[in-house]
C-alpha cells in the first residue's frame, strides 16, 4: 500500500499539464481507492496514466470550429422542441414559458422574461412547518385590493367607488380593514376612504368627469397593499421533507431580504436580476442551467460544453449580451461578418461612409470572398525559407 504523500508526488510528477481541479479530484479518488484496495505503486501510476490519456482525448483539437459545432449541437435538438409549453414541474397553478420560446428568450437576453418566476427556499426554522412557510409566503405575495375584492362597483349617481371585500381572502392575507384604510389614505391624498364592515367606499375629493372616477378606481384596485412589487401569487409545495415557495413574478433583490428565506438557494429565472444581484459569474451559471433544464424538460440531451461556450460569449464583457445584431454579432469588427448576418445593405453603407477596412481575419468574411477559412488546417500559415544560390566565383582573368 502506497502512502498519500507518494500518491501526491506521483500526480504532480506525471500530471504537470492537468488542471488543479482535476489533480485534486484524482488525488481524493486515489486516496479512497487506496484505503479500499491497498494499491501498489505500479497500479497508482497506471491509473494516473489512464486519466492523463482520457483527459488528452477529451481536449478539443487546435483549430476546431467550436462555434459551428455548438450551433449545430444546440440547434438540431431545438427543432424537436414544442413551440409552446405552459406548465412547470407539476406546479399547474403557475404558467412558465418552456420549450423553444424559452431558449430564444435566454439567448436574446431579454430584460423581462415573458413569465418570470422565483423558487424560494426557506431557512432551517421555516422549511419543515407548513404554517411557518405560509407566513413567509404572505410576506412575499403581492396583494392588491383587487385580489381581496368580492365585487367592485362604480356608483355614477353618487360618484363613488364601492369595494366589497371577501372576509376569507382578507383573513388569509393577514390584513385587516383598518390596515387597508390606513394604507390607502396615506397613498391617495385626492380621495376620501370610508369602511363599513367589509365594504370600502372611495370618494374623490374633486371630480369633474366620470373618466376621472374610472381612472381613480383602477389605481385603487391595482394599489399594492403588502408583499413585494412584481410578485403575484405564491404556491407552496412540499419537496422531500421541506416546503418550497414558487412565485409568479420576480423580485430577486427584495426576496433575499425577507425573514425566513434561505438566500443561498433561492433562485429566479430572470438572468438580468441574477447578474445585478449576484454578479456576472452567477448569471453565466444561470444561463447554462436554464438552457439545460429547458432541454431536459423536453427529454433532449446536449453536451454541457456547447452551452457553456454560448454562456461564456454572452457574459464575456461583464454584462449579459444577446446573441444577435444588438449584441455579440452586431459588435463584430468585420464589416462583412456583420453584413452577412442581418440588414446587409445598411451595414455596407455605414462601413463605406466611415471608410472601414476588413482584415478578413474571421470565418464568415473568408467564406464570402472564397478564401480558405482560418479553421483547422487553414489556421496554419506556412512560410518557406529557400536556400540562397551560391554565388559563382569570379573567373580569374
Swiss-Prot record:
Stretches that traverse the bilayer: none
Catalytic activity: RNA(n) + a ribonucleoside 5'-triphosphate = RNA(n+1) + diphosphate
Known role: DNA-dependent RNA polymerase (RNAP) catalyzes the transcription of DNA into RNA using the four ribonucleoside triphosphates as substrates. Forms part of the jaw domain.
The organism of origin for this protein: Pyrococcus horikoshii (strain ATCC 700860 / DSM 12428 / JCM 9974 / NBRC 100139 / OT-3)
Protein name: DNA-directed RNA polymerase subunit Rpo1C
Gene name for this UniProt entry: rpo1C
Segments forming a coiled coil: none
A GO molecular-function annotation: DNA binding
CDD domains: RNAP_A (cd06528)
GO cellular component, one term: DNA-directed RNA polymerase complex
Location of the protein in the cell: Cytoplasm
